[in-house]
C-alpha cells in the first residue's frame, strides 16, 4: 500500500470546493467500519494489485466508468476465466439476464458515487442491480474509486451522488440523456422521468454481515463520475 499521508481536494459542491480531504483520516474511518482499505498513487498500481489479488475466481463487474477507464476487465481476464461484465452481455442476452449473472459470483467489483471522509460510501442506482450485487451474494466485494469521489461527510457524499455523479451518468446514456439533469444545469431536479437513473440511494455504513471481505481501493487520480 502506498503512503497515505496525503491531502487532496475533491469536487463536492461550490460551497465545499476548497475543503481539504485527509486520506489517512478517511482510511481510518473506513477501517473502523470494518472495510479493508488499500491506497494507491496510480491506477496502474491499483490494477496490478487487483490482478494479483483476484485469481482463478468467478468474477462479476458492475457498471462503472472508473473500472472501464482502468481496463479492469482486460486485466482480470488474464488471470480469471469466469467473468461476467454488465457491459459485455452474451450474444442475444437481455440486460436482466446479464444482471442476474452478476449475482452470486465469488468476487464482485464496482465503484461508488461518493465516499465520505467519515467512513460511509454512497451509491445511487436506477435499476438496482449494481447495489444489490454489492450488498449480497458474493464472498468478496471491491469498491474502486478515485480521489474525486471523496467528500467531507455523509451529507456532502449524498449531495455528490445526486448532483454531480447522477447528472454525468445520465448524459452517457441515450435514454437518460433526455433527463433534466442531463439537458439543463447539472443538478438533481427530483424528476419523474421514466428513464431516471436515481431511483434508489444506498449508504454503506459498515461491512455487510456474512461477507468475507468488502475492500475499498482508493486511487490518487480523478476517475469516473
At which residue positions do the language-model features occur?
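Iron-sulfur (Fe-S) cluster-binding modules
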Residues: 1-33, 49, 54, 168-178
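Short linear motifs at secondary-structure transitions and domain/linker junctions
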Residues: 11-15, 34-37, 82-90, 97-100, ...
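Conserved phosphate- and dinucleotide-binding cores of soluble alpha/beta proteins
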Residues: 103-225
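A near-ubiquitous, low-amplitude feature marking generic local secondary-structure context
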Residues: 6-9, 13, 29, 33, ...
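Short N-terminal helix-initiation segments at or just after the protein's N-terminus
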Residues: 2-5, 84-91, 221-223
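Short, mixed-charge, low-aromatic patches
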Residues: 1-7, 30, 89, 109-118
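N-terminal active-site beta-alpha-beta segment that forms phosphate/nucleotide-binding
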Residues: 19, 23-99, 104-109
Amino acid at each position: 500500500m502506498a503512503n497515505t499521508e496525503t491531502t487532496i481536494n475533491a469536487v463536492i459542491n461550490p460551497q465545499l470546493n476548497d475543503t481539504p480531504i485527509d486520506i489517512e483520516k478517511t482510511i481510518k474511518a473506513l477501517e473502523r467500519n470494518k472495510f479493508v482499505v488499500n491506497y494507491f498513487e496510480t491506477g496502474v498500481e491499483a490494477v496490478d494489485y487487483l490482478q494479483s489479488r483476484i485469481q482463478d475466481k468467478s468474477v462479476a463487474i458492475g457498471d462503472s466508468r472508473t473500472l472501464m477507464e482502468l481496463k479492469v476487465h482486460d486485466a482480470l481476464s488474464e488471470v480469471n476465466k469466469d467473468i461476467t461484465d454488465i457491459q459485455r452481455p452474451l450474444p442475444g442476452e437481455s440486460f436482466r439476464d446479464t444482471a442476474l449473472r452478476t449475482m452470486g459470483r465469488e468476487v464482485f467489483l464496482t465503484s461508488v458515487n461518493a465516499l465520505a471522509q467519515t467512513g460511509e460510501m454512497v451509491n445511487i442506482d436506477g435499476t438496482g442491480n449494481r447495489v444489490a450485487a454489492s450488498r449480497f451474494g458474493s464472498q468478496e466485494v471491491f469498491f474502486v474509486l478515485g480521489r474525486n469521489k471523496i467528500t467531507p461527510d455523509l451529507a456532502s457524499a449524498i449531495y455528490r451522488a445526486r448532483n454531480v455523479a447522477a447528472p454525468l451518468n445520465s448524459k452517457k446514456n441515450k435514454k437518460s440523456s433526455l433527463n433534466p439533469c442531463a439537458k439543463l444545469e447539472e443538478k438533481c431536479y427530483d424528476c419523474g422521468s421514466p428513464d431516471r437513473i436515481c431511483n434508489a440511494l444506498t449508504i454503506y455504513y459498515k461491512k455487510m454481515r456474512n461477507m468475507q471481505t468488502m475492500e475499498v481501493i482508493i486511487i490518487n487520480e480523478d476517475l469516473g463520475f
